[in-house]
Amino acid sequence: MRIIGIETSCDETGIAIYDDEKGLLAHKLYSQVKLHADYGGVVPELASRDHVKKTIPLIKEALKEANLTSQDIDGVAYTAGPGLVGALLVGATIGRSIAYAWGVPAVPVHHMEGHLLAPMLEDNPPPFPFVAVLVSGGHSMMVEVKGIGEYKILGESIDDAAGEAFDKTAKLMGLDYPGGPLLSKLAEKGTPGRFKFPRPMTNVPGLDMSFSGLKTFTANTIAANGDDEQTRADIAYAFEEAVCATLAIKCKRALEQTGMKRIVIAGGVSANRRLRAELEKLAKKIGGEVYYPRTEFCTDNGAMIAYAGMQRLKNGEVADMSVEARPRWPIDQLTPIA
């Protein structure tokens, strides 16, 4: 079975073709970073218009890369949510339309389920069950995963997601868009221990998280200490340390609560090297294991959508003729796959 995956939930247009026997046959990704850079963030209308321009050409490129034609495709998977409604509608409309034109089934895919299953694209995929640390620009949550579609949210951010906190703090520090990766790069030059940032909500029971206060703490630290280059690097170090330590503390509690020892890190922030190091240290301490996708599959991409869609199509899930876009869609509402 060969599935083409379409990802347009935010500011990346991702197209991929996945074969259940041969694996990934093609992977195309276009980022809109330059388009939104002048605005300091994603402009939804511009994102939607750019997806309209890029999706069909990328589909053609993916077919060419895989040396396939539309007649070789057995199904279409498209991101139906959560995300920006206009951007989602572009991918959903194109996905549903080409499925109809090609005479194959289509299936809507949950964006975060795609991220959660992205490590399955690797040579050493994680076996079920595990605790997933899903961290991106729009979501931060701890999820108990017993199988595909068997998700229980153990805790989530009550305000800013981790990736959002990185980007907002970077903007506060005068870094260009997208700021999260630039903040992490600046943190590499930081002095450990000069500043100590709080670990939000780690002094209370439960697994919910809060990261918005760290932005205020950063602003106050800059005001009190100046913003010369080394001070900025030291502040970036302390901020990143606080976010990663908080996630590690919450993950440890999630493992204790579930009795599990396997950790999956997924979503855009899963590319962060310090976060990976913190969770690897935790896993080593408890005799567990950590799994994460290669860097190119941490960001939004079509490969994870093609893979997740294949699992859904094999389970008999097929969309009707309507075009489905769900900007809000709790991951624990998905149907388990037997």
UniProtKB/Swiss-Prot annotation:
Q: Which positions in this protein are listed as binding Fe cation?
A: 111, 115, 300
Query: Where does the protein end up?
Result: Cytoplasm
Quote the cellular component terms of the Gene Ontology held in the record: cytoplasm
Q: By its UniProt entry, which InterPro entries does this protein fall under?
A: ATPase_NBD (IPR043129), Gcp-like_dom (IPR000905), KAE1/TsaD (IPR017861), Peptidase_M22_CS (IPR017860), TsaD (IPR022450)
Q: Which reaction does it catalyse?
A: L-threonylcarbamoyladenylate + adenosine(37) in tRNA = N(6)-L-threonylcarbamoyladenosine(37) in tRNA + AMP + H(+)
Q: How, per the record, is the cofactor bound? A: Binds 1 Fe(2+) ion per subunit.
Q: One matching Pfam family, short form?
A: TsaD
Q: Where does substrate bind?
A: 134-138, 167, 180, 272
> Which UniProt keyword terms apply here?
Acyltransferase, Cytoplasm, Iron, Metal-binding, Transferase, tRNA processing
* Class of this enzyme: transferase
Q: Which cofactor does it need?
A: Fe(2+)
Top-level lineage group? Bacteria
One example GO MF annotation: N(6)-L-threonylcarbamoyladenine synthase activity
The biological process GO terms on file are: tRNA threonylcarbamoyladenosine modification
Per the record, the major location class is: cytoplasm
Query: In the Enzyme Commission scheme, what number(s) does this protein have?
Result: 2.3.1.234
| NCBIfam families, alphabetized | gcp_kae1, T6A_TsaD_YgjD
Describe the family membership recorded for this protein in Swiss-Prot or TrEMBL.
Answer: Belongs to the KAE1 / TsaD family.
Biological role:
Required for the formation of a threonylcarbamoyl group on adenosine at position 37 (t(6)A37) in tRNAs that read codons beginning with adenine. Is involved in the transfer of the threonylcarbamoyl moiety of threonylcarbamoyl-AMP (TC-AMP) to the N6 group of A37, together with TsaE and TsaB. TsaD likely plays a direct catalytic role in this reaction.
Name assigned to this protein: tRNA N6-adenosine threonylcarbamoyltransferase
Species name: Vibrio parahaemolyticus serotype O3:K6 (strain RIMD 2210633)
Q: What taxonomic classification does the UniProt entry list for its organism? A: Bacteria, Pseudomonadati, Pseudomonadota, Gammaproteobacteria, Vibrionales
Gene label: tsaD
